Amino acid sequence: MRTSKYLLSTLKETPNDAQVVSHQLMLRAGMIRPLASGLYNWLPTGLRVLKKVENIVREEMNKSGAIEVEMPVVQPAELWQESQRWEQYGPELLRFVDRGNRDFVLGPTHEEVITDLVHREVSSYKQLPLNLYQIQTKFRDEVRPRFGVMRGREFLMKDAYSFHTSKECLQNTYDVMYRTYNNIFTRLGLDFRAVQADTGSIGGSASHEFQVLAKSGEDDIVFSSNSDYAANIELAEAVAIGQRQAPSATMELVDTPNAKTINDLVEQFNLSVEKTVKTLIVKGANEGQPLIALIVRGDHELNEVKAQKLPEVADPLEFANEDEIKTKIGASIGSLGPVNLPIPAIIDRSVALMSDFSTGANIDGKHYFNVNWDRDVALPKVADLRNVVEGDPSPDGKGTLQIKRGIEVGHIFQLGTKYSEAMKATVQGEDGRPQTMIMGCYGIGVSRVVAATIEQCHDEKGIIWSSDEIAPFTVAIIPMNMYKSKNVQIFAEELYQSLLNKNVDVIFDDRKERPGVMFADMELIGVPHMIVIGEKNLEKGEIEYKNRRTGEKQIIAKEQVLDFLAQRVNA
């Protein structure tokens, strides 16, 4: 590709409304341009990268035995009503009515459509297992689109769905998809982690997220220093070690009129925050127990996903308001605790090991100091309630936990029969009777992968693509003052044609621009290999090679340039 025939569209200045690095660089590199909130045009440079990522995903999915299909973006409401997600999904599901007054949606995902399709096409257990995928545009009406294509309303996604007659068969395909995703993100050259995750609104049993490590990530991911253990912070198990110490002081009721928070209490009474507990009141799952107390250590945070999974707690999790708490307990938030508490309590594992701790007295303006389990208050139910913190022991007993920010780029689920049961998707089983199909689903945000890669791989000059395979161009030819030197022009043209003949993805900067502008643009868009052709070097039979990723510079004989590049491109 010649730059004189190409829409390069780079920008010198960073747009003011771009908050994260990937959004800034995708705009500056001429990869995308905004159309409306959360909607973007993909310009040639961006589309080249997007298509290359898409091709890697497609190649690895095909290797896994999955079969590509394509389904409509527009979906009839009846399917969503049949699966019962019409009411559940919320306002991010864009609904509309056609001229025949029929309800439709713009698909944010395709569980309903694929279940309906397979139900119609597959009739016998002999046709299973089956894993179908598509790479297609999705739409979710995000309440606050931000960060460019990282969280846009329209995005490109690879979504796959597998169908089985047994859990063992599902597990086999799930394991294949797990390995396939690892292959995809390894091939993309990304630093990533596969982490245990919550199934969320999709539903099902087992689930893993694939997270690209990046400081700008929206998720906290947890992994062990000495093992393969990794989990989303929502699911990471918090281990409590040690034993409860014997009481060393008598419980004391203390006036604390100005201590409304744990920080107030710690500062005013010179307490260790590790010796305090906080009591949070949530709605109960049973009418007989409308409120439940959840108690964690003062320096820990309640994990709402873990709390919501407790059978005693209402789903979705809902905190009680001040009036409800005051009416039932007789004290305000900030003065609550387990002693003489008139509602059931569940305490975190770490709280169960505490002794001589301080807590609200369920009397406004008062706290108990030196509280001990069994002696002063019966030990309630114990559960894992908190978020892990850096340095916690790993649940597998190997090493300690580290926490980093991550960008979710892939998610795999074992759905079970959530959709097939609701939509009566059955096949004839081996015994001749109808059998509900068991499902898995596997998603990759293809356009999000592009942004996540840039978040992880960039410098002050621009993008550094993590793999030659996804760079918009793998080689750039930069001729210095080409229009003033016949020798430079001739060699640059010959090299360009030679690289094209070898199917190298090359960009030839044949603009009448200063060399500094050419270098800046090629570094900005992240071309990994640059060949610099100058009159003085050519007179010595040499050209200069620059590596965008390592910063390496090397003078090589011009006759060796093709062999030299062959050893480095995609290496």
Curated annotation (Swiss-Prot):
Quote the EC number. 6.1.1.15
The entry's cellular-component GO terms read: cytosol
Give the enzyme's main class according to its UniProt record, as a single word: ligase
Catalyzed reactions per annotation: tRNA(Pro) + L-proline + ATP = L-prolyl-tRNA(Pro) + AMP + diphosphate
In the record, biological process GO terms are: prolyl-tRNA aminoacylation
User: Where is it localised?
Assistant: Cytoplasm
Alphabetized GO MF terms: aminoacyl-tRNA deacylase activity; ATP binding; proline-tRNA ligase activity
Q: Does the keyword Nucleotide-binding apply?
A: yes
What keywords are annotated for this sequence in UniProt? Aminoacyl-tRNA synthetase, ATP-binding, Cytoplasm, Ligase, Nucleotide-binding, Protein biosynthesis
* Major subcellular site: cytoplasm
Top-level taxon? Bacteria
Q: What does this protein do?
A: Catalyzes the attachment of proline to tRNA(Pro) in a two-step reaction: proline is first activated by ATP to form Pro-AMP and then transferred to the acceptor end of tRNA(Pro). As ProRS can inadvertently accommodate and process non-cognate amino acids such as alanine and cysteine, to avoid such errors it has two additional distinct editing activities against alanine. One activity is designated as 'pretransfer' editing and involves the tRNA(Pro)-independent hydrolysis of activated Ala-AMP.
Quaternary arrangement and interactors, per the entry? Answer: Homodimer.
By sequence similarity, the record places it as follows:
Belongs to the class-II aminoacyl-tRNA synthetase family. ProS type 1 subfamily.
* Listed PANTHER family: MITOCHONDRIAL RIBOSOME PROTEIN L39/PROLYL-TRNA LIGASE FAMILY MEMBER, PROLINE--TRNA LIGASE
Swiss-Prot/TrEMBL domain comment: Consists of three domains: the N-terminal catalytic domain, the editing domain and the C-terminal anticodon-binding domain.
Q: What is this protein called?
A: Proline--tRNA ligase
- Identify the coding gene: proS
